Amino acid sequence: MEILNYSEIDLAETIKRSEEDVNKVLDIVSDILNNVKLNKDDAIREYTEKFDGVTIENLKVSKDEIEEAYDTLDDSLLVALKQAASNIEKFHKKQIPSEWELEVNPGIVAGQIVRPINSAGCYIPGGRAAYPSSILMTVIPAKIAGVKKVVCVTPPQKDGKILDAILVAADIAGADEIYKVGGAQAIAGLAYGTESIPRVEKIVGPGNIFVTAAKKLVYGQVDIEFPAGPSEVLILADDSANPEFLATDILAQAEHDPNASCFLVTDSKDLAIKTDEFVNQLTQIAPRREIIEESLSKSGKIIITNTMDEAIYVTNEYAPEHLIISTKDDDETLSHINNAGSIFLGSYSPVAAGDYGSGTNHVLPTGGGAKMYSGLSTEAFIKKPTVQRLTKEGLKELSKTSVPIAEYEGFFAHANSFKTRLK
């Protein structure tokens, strides 16, 4: 990893992400979207054969296929998926917002009610690996929110099937339908609907540059969660941290993707050097060594600051997807953090705990998005309409406020809706 002194760097340049240029594929993706919108299932099958190398007759996964997946899945993985689902469910139930009302003034009651959206689509990536955990993280919050129809889409394997773990995870999470389609064409199917794939109101879940571009283009016709990019971690630590623990977290992030970003920010030069030594040692024996080395060569940095205040400033400026805090007083350090997708406190809270089963969601904002967005949650699938109820006396009192403003703005019919009721 590159070791840098805070006093000698251009911070903005140092923390700049390696970017996927979504714009360069927009024309290609736009053509895919338009083709699917026009030709529906035929276009879906065309692109599945072209990009995935497989011909799919029935896009929808059958009940028999799900039952077969249960029969062949390793028992220990089944138990693990069920336990992870239970933890995720517990956490996301606490996120359900409350309905409430208050008396703003005598005779004027206003409040909030809670209603789920009707349908959601969950994109589950294929490619380098299968991610049953991503199904749990996207489907469970939607079902807890009360979404009636939750649809999963995921690329088929070369044999035309979906991996057993994906099907079982979708069933455990409560997915209503699963379709054998990936890429931009899957997003198009969810956004516009086809003969097989239902149109949904919101699309969530990470994907490659083509999926990201497709979500960007259909946004406004359907909702999406937030822009997604390469995975990232920032570790904020002092000399009390265990350098070997930190090294394992750096490698855990780096093995995701060659474009993953890994930062250690510390006021301890000794910790910086020891952590880097462990990173080098562990990389040599890592099964995904090539990916890790490429990732760290691109975006693996250790920044040594003079003070923890400087380290905290760097952290908030970077706004990491994942933030590990390993300091003498983690809660005190946490009180100064404003920008992070998900935060892991102390020596025994690796990012992987949140990835799989601590209960929090691992679909998180990247690329500095944590300055503006929160991670995926139950609330992402919920609307909160406001409600008001006025008595005649309340309306009369409110007219003293509303009528002058309405007339000043030139909305005389607005003002008249008060006056008529108060005759």
Model-found features: residue ranges?
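N-terminal Rossmann-like NAD(P)+-binding subdomain of aldehyde/semialdehyde dehydrogenases
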Residues: 1-118
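Short acidic-hydrophobic, aromatic-tinged amphipathic segments that line or gate anion-handling sites
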Residues: 1-7, 177-182, 302-307
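Conserved small-residue-rich beta-alpha loop and adjacent elements
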Residues: 102-168
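Alpha-helix C-terminal capping segments
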Residues: 137-148, 171-173, 191-197, 215-217, ...
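Conserved NAD(P)+-binding/catalytic subdomain of aldehyde/semialdehyde dehydrogenases
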Residues: 174-245, 249-252, 256-261
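Short loop-to-beta-strand entry elements in the cores of soluble alpha/beta enzymes
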Residues: 204-206, 226-237, 253-276, 292-303, ...
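C-terminal core of ALDH-fold dehydrogenases
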Residues: 317-423
